């Protein structure tokens, strides 16, 4: 059963009317209602607030990394474990094919349903997850395979065990190694990009965001609690933080915005996956036209140009 957000209620009513008309075989009414639906979708989704985009990024039905991996990849083989401590289920690593390209894919996975959410730790990786990701990235480098990273996490896990196993070092190590990785790399924020947990697989030649994804140094809830001592002011915090794909593109913090379906990736997973696949393959083609030195130099300039200052 589809889940509708508060601002999608008119869409829900029209879609229910369409189903009712289809049951009655009233083709004329179905056609009319579908036109009304297209108009309502355009009206709502072309005027979304940052807070509404945050709700879409966190939508319970939004495709996760594993959904995209299953839709995009074939002949795939999963890579397990960091060879130091354990296998972290919050990070997925696969080698396989996207189209005719042999690739390595790394993704952060939130999980669906209570048992799976617990297994995936709600998409919050431990240090061993980031070390597994680095192991997969190094395999891509060793065999000269392109790397695709799918970012979707509220943040790195802040528990005692994670800190004892040096969470900050694992993230910092990934930032260093991925910035110097000698193969083509593309990172895409598919849902939530939360702080260092997102950055740990976000350093790449190309960094893109899905239309309704978000990327921030802290959650809006955390920001509102710190600034106003009131978690209820999350909407104000969201508006002020500039966390949407449009804001971040304007600030030159990302390279591209991937046009997921206007109504949201959760309503049309196949089209959303196809958009990621097309973006990956087209950007990979561009990266391969560069010399290795040119590509590494461009990556370095991009990473060192992040931020702004005034004297």
UniProtKB/Swiss-Prot annotation:
GO MF term (any one): ATP binding
Main location: cytoplasm
Protein's GO biological process: fatty acid biosynthetic process; malonyl-CoA biosynthetic process
Location of the CoA carboxyltransferase C-terminal domain: 36-286
Subcellular location, record wording: Cytoplasm
Pfam families noted in UniProt: ACCA
Keyword Cytoplasm: yes
Database matches in InterPro entries: Acetyl_CoA_COase_a_su, ClpP/crotonase-like_dom_sf, COA_CT_C
Pathway: Lipid metabolism; malonyl-CoA biosynthesis; malonyl-CoA from acetyl-CoA: step 1/1
Keywords for the protein's UniProt record, in alphabetical order: ATP-binding, Cytoplasm, Fatty acid biosynthesis, Fatty acid metabolism, Lipid biosynthesis, Lipid metabolism, Nucleotide-binding, Transferase
One cellular-component annotation, GO: acetyl-CoA carboxylase complex
Catalytic activity, as annotated: N(6)-carboxybiotinyl-L-lysyl-[protein] + acetyl-CoA = N(6)-biotinyl-L-lysyl-[protein] + malonyl-CoA
The enzyme's E.C. designation: 2.1.3.15
Record carries keyword Ribonucleoprotein: no
Purpose of the protein: Component of the acetyl coenzyme A carboxylase (ACC) complex. First, biotin carboxylase catalyzes the carboxylation of biotin on its carrier protein (BCCP) and then the CO(2) group is transferred by the carboxyltransferase to acetyl-CoA to form malonyl-CoA.
Xref: HAMAP family: AcetylCoA_CT_alpha
Similarity-based family: Belongs to the AccA family.
Database matches in NCBIfam families: accA (TIGR00513), AccA_sub (NF041504), PRK05724.1 (NF004344)
Oligomer and partners: Acetyl-CoA carboxylase is a heterohexamer composed of biotin carboxyl carrier protein (AccB), biotin carboxylase (AccC) and two subunits each of ACCase subunit alpha (AccA) and ACCase subunit beta (AccD).
Name of this protein: Acetyl-coenzyme A carboxylase carboxyl transferase subunit alpha
Organism annotation: Sulfurimonas denitrificans (strain ATCC 33889 / DSM 1251) (Thiomicrospira denitrificans (strain ATCC 33889 / DSM 1251))
Gene: accA
């Amino acid at each position: 059963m589809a889940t509708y957000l508060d601002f999608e209620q008119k869409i829900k009513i029209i879609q229910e009317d369409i189903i009712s008309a289809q049951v009655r075989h009233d083709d004329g009414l179905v056609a009319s209602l579908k036109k009304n639906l297209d108009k309502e979708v355009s009206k709502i989704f072309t005027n979304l607030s940052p807070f509404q985009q945050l709700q879409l990024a966190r939508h319970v039905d939004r495709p996760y990394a594993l959904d995209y991996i299953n839709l995009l990849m074939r002949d795939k083989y999963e890579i397990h474990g960091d060879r130091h401590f354990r296998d972290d289920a919050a990070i997925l690593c696969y080698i396989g094919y996207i189209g005719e390209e042999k690739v390595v894919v790394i993704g952060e996975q939130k999980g669906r349903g209570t048992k799976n959410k617990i297994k995936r730790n709600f998409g919050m990786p431990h240090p061993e997850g980031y070390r597994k990701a680095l192991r997969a990235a190094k395999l891509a480098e060793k065999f000269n395979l392109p790397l695709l990273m799918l970012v979707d996490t509220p943040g790195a896990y802040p528990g005692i065990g994670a800190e004892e196993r040096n969470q900050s070092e694992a993230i910092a190590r990934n930032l260093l190694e991925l910035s110097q990785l000698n193969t083509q790399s593309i990172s895409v924020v598919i849902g939530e990009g939360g702080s260092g947990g997102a950055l740990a697989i976000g350093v790449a030649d190309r960094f893109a965001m899905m239309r309704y994804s978000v990327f921030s140094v802290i959650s809006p809830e955390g920001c509102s609690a710190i600034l106003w001592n009131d978690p209820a002011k999350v909407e104000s915090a969201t508006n002020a933080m500039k966390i949407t794909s449009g804001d971040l593109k304007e600030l030159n913090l990302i390279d591209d915005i991937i046009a997921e379906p206007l109504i949201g990736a959760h309503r049309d997973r196949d089209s959303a996956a196809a958009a990621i696949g097309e973006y990956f393959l087209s950007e990979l083609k561009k990266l391969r036209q560069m010399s290795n030195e040119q590509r590494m130099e461009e990556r370095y300039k991009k990473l060192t140009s992040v931020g702004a200052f005034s004297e």
